[in-house]
Amino acid sequence: MVEATAQETDRPRFSFSIAAREGKARTGTIEMKRGVIRTPAFMPVGTAATVKALKPETVRATGADIILGNTYHLMLRPGAERIAKLGGLHSFMGWDRPILTDSGGYQVMSLSSLTKQSEEGVTFKSHLDGSRHMLSPERSIEIQHLLGSDIVMAFDECTPYPATPSRAASSMERSMRWAKRSRDAFDSRKEQAENAALFGIQQGSVFENLRQQSADALAEIGFDGYAVGGLAVGEGQDEMFRVLDFSVPMLPDDKPHYLMGVGKPDDIVGAVERGIDMFDCVLPTRSGRNGQAFTWDGPINIRNARFSEDLTPLDSECHCAVCQKWSRAYIHHLIRAGEILGAMLMTEHNIAFYQQLMQKIRDSISEGRFSQFAQDFRARYFARNS
């Protein structure tokens, strides 16, 4: 796959347009130099410069317009400077469409040991070899530039959950100072400022007043898009939806809204109802490798013995290449035997299912029937467990 350099097209650096609305739900497009992203969008996670078990062309064939890369993992292995030397992340991995990179802040806190936070940034030991590293707003933006990211995320502090109001406030305030430093670092690089987009991240834990302060600070700095951070960290769906109900309306309406690290199909439907436009999550890839397939009738565990002679596809309504060719019985056998092909087929199906879900969401918003779609989706998805 030949890399499409950001300079080769007539498309804008970044342009978001909303084509239709229903309630708080919106559908539209993000135009960038490397391609158009249909929203609401689900971004498969390509942690280490690969969506695990899938070739880039397979990821694209599922309907994905954009993927996510992880700054933390790539800075440690193979290294951001090495990727830049080898032509950038798009060329390196053979994906010619947009890539969003996270800032590394979440992984630093969740994966590395002996982290030490200061106003400057975070020092930490690599989970791979124990080597010491420093990640600051400036270094995070530099790494994302070296990778050649299309959508760059501001560096933030991931507030632990649960947090007291005072702890959440001090964490949010530091994240806002880091957001300004991220903006300045991004703008200081002409190539990055002219070809990529920068998103800010709203923090404030579950507290409405802190979320409002954070949204106001981010809007004053100015970003191309706005993420809702600090959710999907163990608070549960009800609490997440409660926070989204008041948090999303605080963000600029004319910019994309990105819910980081979410989620299950029903999380996505509920978040779209609350005005979210972009999602990413490891769930379809990770759970696929472990034998969980997503279907319109809810998830199934393909390892279960009841599928050992089931000749039907993973989902009878799925249009993916896997469901056109292979049976539950065959994939059951592959997963039980630990065969690599099992992980490949399960992952491809799950990513395709998520993309078909997003297409149905977009179509139903466009046609003014999203609330009915959401109701029907939930009734069927949870019917087995009711």
Swiss-Prot record:
Its cofactor is Zn(2+). One of its GO terms (cellular component) is cytosol. Zn(2+) binds at residues 318, 320, 323, 349. The active site is at residues 102, 280. The keyword Metal-binding applies. Its EC number is 2.4.2.29. It comes from the Bacteria. Gene3D superfamilies: Queuine tRNA-ribosyltransferase-like. It holds the Pfam family TGT. InterPro entries: ArchSynthase1/Queuine_TRR (IPR050076), TGT (IPR004803), TGT-like_sf (IPR036511), tRNA_ribo_trans-like (IPR002616). One of its GO terms (molecular function) is metal ion binding. One of its GO terms (biological process) is tRNA-guanine transglycosylation. It catalyses: 7-aminomethyl-7-carbaguanine + guanosine(34) in tRNA = 7-aminomethyl-7-carbaguanosine(34) in tRNA + guanine. Substrate binds at residues 102-106, 156, 203, 230. Residues 261-267, 285-289 are annotated as: RNA binding. Keywords: Glycosyltransferase, Metal-binding, Queuosine biosynthesis, Transferase, tRNA processing, Zinc. Binds 1 zinc ion per subunit. Pathway: tRNA modification; tRNA-queuosine biosynthesis. Belongs to the queuine tRNA-ribosyltransferase family. Catalyzes the base-exchange of a guanine (G) residue with the queuine precursor 7-aminomethyl-7-deazaguanine (PreQ1) at position 34 (anticodon wobble position) in tRNAs with GU(N) anticodons (tRNA-Asp, -Asn, -His and -Tyr). Catalysis occurs through a double-displacement mechanism. The nucleophile active site attacks the C1' of nucleotide 34 to detach the guanine base from the RNA, forming a covalent enzyme-RNA intermediate. The proton acceptor active site deprotonates the incoming PreQ1, allowing a nucleophilic attack on the C1' of the ribose to form the product. Homodimer. Within each dimer, one monomer is responsible for RNA recognition and catalysis, while the other monomer binds to the replacement base PreQ1. This is Queuine tRNA-ribosyltransferase. The lineage of its organism: Bacteria, Pseudomonadati, Pseudomonadota, Alphaproteobacteria, Sphingomonadales.
